[in-house]
Amino acid sequence: MKIPNIGNVMNKFEILGVVGEGAYGVVLKCRHKETHEIVAIKKFKDSEENEEVKETTLRELKMLRTLKQENIVELKEAFRRRGKLYLVFEYVEKNMLELLEEMPNGVPPEKVKSYIYQLIKAIHWCHKNDIVHRDIKPENLLISHNDVLKLCDFGFARNLSEGNNANYTEYVATRWYRSPELLLGAPYGKSVDMWSVGCILGELSDGQPLFPGESEIDQLFTIQKVLGPLPSEQMKLFYSNPRFHGLRFPAVNHPQSLERRYLGILNSVLLDLMKNLLKLDPADRYLTEQCLNHPTFQTQRLLDRSPSRSAKRKPYHVESSTLSNRNQAGKSTALQSHHRSNSKDIQNLSVGLPRADEGLPANESFLNGNLAGASLSPLHTKTYQASSQPGSTSKDLTNNNIPHLLSPKEAKSKTEFDFNIDPKPSEGPGTKYLKSNSRSQQNRHSFMESSQSKAGTLQPNEKQSRHSYIDTIPQSSRSPSYRTKAKSHGALSDSKSVSNLSEARAQIAEPSTSRYFPSSCLDLNSPTSPTPTRHSDTRTLLSPSGRNNRNEGTLDSRRTTTRHSKTMEELKLPEHMDSSHSHSLSAPHESFSYGLGYTSPFSSQQRPHRHSMYVTRDKVRAKGLDGSLSIGQGMAARANSLQLLSPQPGEQLPPEMTVARSSVKETSREGTSSFHTRQKSEGGVYHDPHSDDGTAPKENRHLYNDPVPRRVGSFYRVPSPRPDNSFHENNVSTRVSSLPSESSSGTNHSKRQPAFDPWKSPENISHSEQLKEKEKQGFFRSMKKKKKKSQTVPNSDSPDLLTLQKSIHSASTPSSRPKEWRPEKISDLQTQSQPLKSLRKLLHLSSASNHPASSDPRFQPLTAQQTKNSFSEIRIHPLSQASGGSSNIRQEPAPKGRPALQLPGQMDPGWHVSSVTRSATEGPSYSEQLGAKSGPNGHPYNRTNRSRMPNLNDLKETAL
């Protein structure tokens, strides 16, 4: 492994720009001055002086020399200059992070499958060679112009020769894509890479990161919010890990579930693959061989046969001599090598084109296993070639990239695989394709080599091939490698055994959760409403950041908002998932227990931007964030619940909370059916609620009529009554003052409680924490005063809270009023958050003389207003009671007719002031109260006022 120490090598290249920077150096885009080939040169800093950097760079160099495969970035050469190591790679146009930024709502399903299939093939090749990547994430997945995916950055890769479950370094893998065993410091193996694949599958599908935790413990909490509790073995590891000393394990009783999260986004087959990739117990997690033979990849396996051959060559494109069999390939490698930037695939032996045509038979030579074998053998070591020659060679080389194994050891392993495959391939007609056929061949029906693939593939593959094209999976992952993988899988699977139970639990809870906790699925937003449209619309609409962005009208602005919203979103998300579930179910405490103010007990409420770890992604991600968070995929939902539960994220959180709550109320009040409809249309539905602005009165009536608790999911979704489809934006109203204003306008009705938050959202956003505290205190006092004054006033206080709680608890409540109110408020606040303040002040003045006083410290004015305007406020509250159906006690004081009579704006003013103050102060307290409350409609409001959650407690007491 000698690295030439050539001082003038860099003189051969013209530097075109900087592709990226990392901890170990910089990546430059360069053009070879003679061949004009575009390459990426990774320049390590201080390779000689820094032992850690040196070890990492040499490890990466060794791995890359060993791993030659079509879906692994090609190392062209390595050299030293002035004590620094330079690695010359093929240039690939972009990475998946940038792709997700371009497509914030996710990638089309067929492309998702294609990318995941290629990624699994690359990982399969790594695992076949006992290498675990350990840092699989979107920015380490390069995507060429013709959609060929290449795995790069092996700086954290590790050789598992010591054993699959050796206890390696814990701090590897970007947090969001880190498996539970890595987070807990448990022994791990190849299954850690499979977990990352599952996370990326979800992210590609809806544009949002699946588990965006902001710390190790928050990551565990975020994972459990979706997948359910960890196995008991992992729980023990948590308590025995000194890193988590003194922390309570972040248990979640009502997980969202992958089904609900990706309802209407992923089909059942792909969802099954994802669930098996995201098994909490690594022993139960699918490994590459099982994935490649999964029914969802039938088409890919079939296409892979011919393209995989081309792909094989591509891996060998290094020498394109192999491809020289197709002289065009050899020539194009030389000529197109400069075009690499344009088409790396082509460069790679100009197999790029055939490869691009993976779906196609690819090269004629590839179509004939013979050509593939011949072309492949020249490219790589003959040892490798020989092993692949047996019949599956060509396919193995092409599909399995066996020829990529330049090292004799790799050739050996490849040979072994080939042999394994060969015997089976002999079964199939085209032994030469065996390896590549292992997948493609596995489908005897699908391609000429399907029988081979069947023979060359693992038994499961064969079975699958019989049934479908599943067997084709092995194409790029050689069937032998699959077999080998199977062996390694066995070793890996030995490590854990509890995940099944936990998963079963999670799944069981998930269905119910979907029903009862759409809010947690907010994102998903409610399995009931999920629709394909929701997937696309929701992404843009649902993400809180997305909404805010919409308000701002830019992805960039979104990005800024994304940070805020992200923080809020994150807060929201975990809580959203958890609290919403807990709200709708009987376990509000759990969500509260962790998220009173946090998305999770461990969240700082400032979730990293979509990819905080990626500078580039963060910027672009703003879009993605919108989409991802907005989808209600859990991020937005989480953020919403958190915001509702706590004002911790500072200024933004309270408004967000308010908005989310108001939307919840609105949604629940609007009418279950209408809510479901909206949820289903996710984007369009929310548009409807937005368009419903004028229908607030009706919705108020609906609220009366529909005391049934709305789904939490719907409650979270409703926050986006805007036509923008920025449902999450409303939830994330804190991000954009306009959102809060929207909420406020929506909250003009008594149910619109969040409106107050939006009011103060402009102010509170700037200094929401202070306002919150003041408002909380003032509101608390006002609540007490109201209680003392008369039950009517307390009733007015509690209706908001109750309504909110009701809406939250009654995710399925079919009261449409909240939505309607919200649209009005939204229309008002959307236009002007600040003006809304003044307007509201005016409205409050008209409805309650004291309301205007509470413009800034809404809560304090509310206090006065509530006490002074107990009648008007009470009236409003009765309305809200009737509408909410949760404040039945209050409803006594105010007839239901009153809501109909009252204008949404009028009712909201007095009602809103108190409710807003509550929502702002209650954000967190609300969640607590929800947890404390026993029922959505008939909660005992006996709780004493809490300084932290004065609004909710006061409301409860007043209701009592």
Swiss-Prot record:
**What is the reaction catalyzed?**
L-seryl-[protein] + ATP = O-phospho-L-seryl-[protein] + ADP + H(+); L-threonyl-[protein] + ATP = O-phospho-L-threonyl-[protein] + ADP + H(+)
**A single GO BP annotation from the record?**
regulation of cilium assembly
Annotated region (Disordered), positions in chain: 300-349, 382-566, 646-834, 848-960
Which superkingdom, per the lineage? Eukaryota
Record's compositionally biased regions (Polar residues): 319-336, 382-402, 434-462, 473-482, 510-548, 728-748, 791-816, 862-872, 880-890, 914-928
Annotated effect of mutating C152F: In DEE2; affect activity; causes mislocalization of the protein in the cytoplasm
Q: Does the keyword Kinase apply?
A: yes
Q: Which Pfam families match?
A: Pkinase (PF00069)
The PTM entry states: Autophosphorylated.
Residues the record lists as binding ATP: V19, G20, E21, G22, A23, Y24, G25, V26, V27, K42
Q: How does it assemble?
A: Interacts with MECP2.
Q: Which disease is it linked to?
A: Chromosomal aberrations involving CDKL5 are found in patients manifesting early-onset seizures and spams and psychomotor impairment. Translocation t(X;6)(p22.3;q14); translocation t(X;7)(p22.3;p15). Developmental and epileptic encephalopathy 2: A severe form of epilepsy characterized by seizures or spasms beginning in infancy. Patients with epileptic encephalopathy early infantile type 2 manifest features resembling Rett syndrome such as microcephaly, lack of speech development, stereotypic hand movements. However, DEE2 and Rett syndrome are considered two distinct entities.
The protein in question is named Cyclin-dependent kinase-like 5
> Which organism is this protein's natural source?
Homo sapiens
The gene it comes from is CDKL5
